[in-house]
Amino acid sequence: MSLNMYLGEVQGQTQSMNAVCNATIQGMEQVIQSIDAFAIDTVLQGQTYSSAKSFFVQTFRPLAQGIIYLCEELIRQNDAFPSQFQSQVASTDVIEQEILEQIREIDRMKASMEAISQAMPIPGMDAMANLFTVMRKKLQEKLDHLYQFNQTSSNNYSTALQLAASIAAGLAEVQSGKGFSPASGTFSTQGLNMEWTTSIQAITEERARQAANSIEEGEMCGKLPEKSTGEKIWDGIVEGTGQAVSDTIDGIKALGDWETWENMGNAALHPIDTLSTMYNTLSDSFINDVINGDAESRAKWGSYALTQVGLGLIGDKGLSKASKLGQAGKVTKLAKNKIPQAVSHITSNLQMGDRFAFAGGNSLRFRFDTPDFKKAEEKLSTYQFARGESNYGGSNFVNENHRSSLSNREIISNLQHTEKFRPNTLKHILEGEINWRGDAMGYHTEVLENTPGKIISGTEEILNDQGIYKARVEVNGTPKTGNRGFSTFFPKDWSPQKIVDNINEAYNNRTYEFGNTYSGIGSEGIRISMYIDGNGKIISAFPAE
């Protein structure tokens, strides 16, 4: 089988594979937001609810987070793959059989020239023979580089394979039937092997440290450097959803599609195969709504993939088709079709039993038909009723113990027009936070209740007749030290959405001041100072003194 690299085709189709990953990232971020909303809901009380919240946060949340990290890693490697080929092998298409034929032709010509030279010496024949020798050497070097690239390129995806292995191990654990106790009616991870979360948690902690450093530096130094593609994706996925837990459960069920992860492992080992087949196997809806659509259609497609299909990775929505690389058949080949040992090892060690079920054709699906999940679905189905929601379009009776209310997280997640803000910026502005060094940061409005940030009594000062004031603040009992301990505050009658809208207006007419500091005039005529990172995202914003 010939080893071929059609560089132009690979570069063009990289966008298709990355689009699938981006849509999956969006869907998984929505799953995480739904789980978080359920976990912090103060209306749902009791032993079963409390244990269920903890169980979902400790199991399904890291699974969704791991999928995000996996997709980000695939995007990084997909973007790097063509450039690595160009630097290591060639800047044009390389077809193994063509190079071999050229080498054989040179060998034939050299043999003919030597025979002629022996029979009848011709001036300049030696120089021509040397030229052919040089040409042959160059072709052989290109071929050797192709072989070497073929052997080493799959190593670039080792991190992705490790993440896929962790995700598969996590899926096996949560389906083991050991997470729910019928006797006590509670959920627990005590009987589960949670080692699979280690690699995912390590990435999460590193991201948190980087984010904390960026916010701290953003208030004290010059412009931050341009971020990588993965970081841009990370900053762009936070969006309010208001998903009910029943939708989250649908998404979680789809996490159990083992075929998806087997295909993902195959995709990682055969990147050229992936890029060569992705475009032709995407469904029409994906091409229309994601590749050729606008931001709204992409968001709608991602939301549909979450609530109606799960992850957007099964059926005709993309990856379960597009990643069947070893089954593609008549496509360009660079590597042999073999399922990686790591993925095969995971497959062989999963206890099948009743946890596997055939779901049409010859595809083997990994299902959440386990006691744990059924109990969770049964117990948590009341979550919609506790929030006054119904699947039938009406309102449900809510008693005094289940009174509907919106948490601060839900209020923030439902804000509109937040595309210009970094993921944690609105929490930073509206609630205040403690950075990784333990310093109190932000807090520029009193509009929300029960926030970490508080005004220190007796320190409030009116700054102007527009309603702007300042005060010394503390966050979770820690006094703020930056800016002499003061924060400036938006008017007390401004809603969170009004604050966002005014910051957006100030952003649109901003002028540069120094470092990464800008200022602009909000829609209500108030001057707003902003810290903006190298990617154009707002780190913090507050009324100017």
UniProtKB/Swiss-Prot annotation:
Pfam families in the record: EndoU_bacteria, LXG
Coiled coil segments of this chain: none
Localization terms from the record: Secreted
E.C. designation(s): 3.1.-.-
GO CC term, one of those recorded: extracellular region
Main location: secreted
Domain (LXG): residue spans on this chain: 1-217
UniProt keywords, alphabetically: Hydrolase, Nuclease, Secreted, Toxin
Quaternary organization: Probably interacts with cognate immunity protein BC_0921. The interaction inhibits the toxic activity of BC_0921.
Family: In the N-terminal section; belongs to the LXG family. In the C-terminal section; belongs to the bacterial EndoU family.
Described function: Toxic component of an LXG toxin-immunity module. The C-terminus (residues 322-545) has RNase activity in E.coli which is neutralized by cognate immunity protein BC_0921, but not by immunity proteins specific to other toxins with the LXG domain. Degrades 5S rRNA and several tRNAs in vitro; cleavage is endonucleolytic within the anticodon loop for tRNA(GAU-Ile) and tRNA(UUC-Glu) but total for 5S rRNA and at least one other tRNA. RNase activity is suppressed by cognate immunity protein BC_0921.
Name the record gives this protein: Toxin BC_0920
Species this chain originates from: Bacillus cereus (strain ATCC 14579 / DSM 31 / CCUG 7414 / JCM 2152 / NBRC 15305 / NCIMB 9373 / NCTC 2599 / NRRL B-3711)
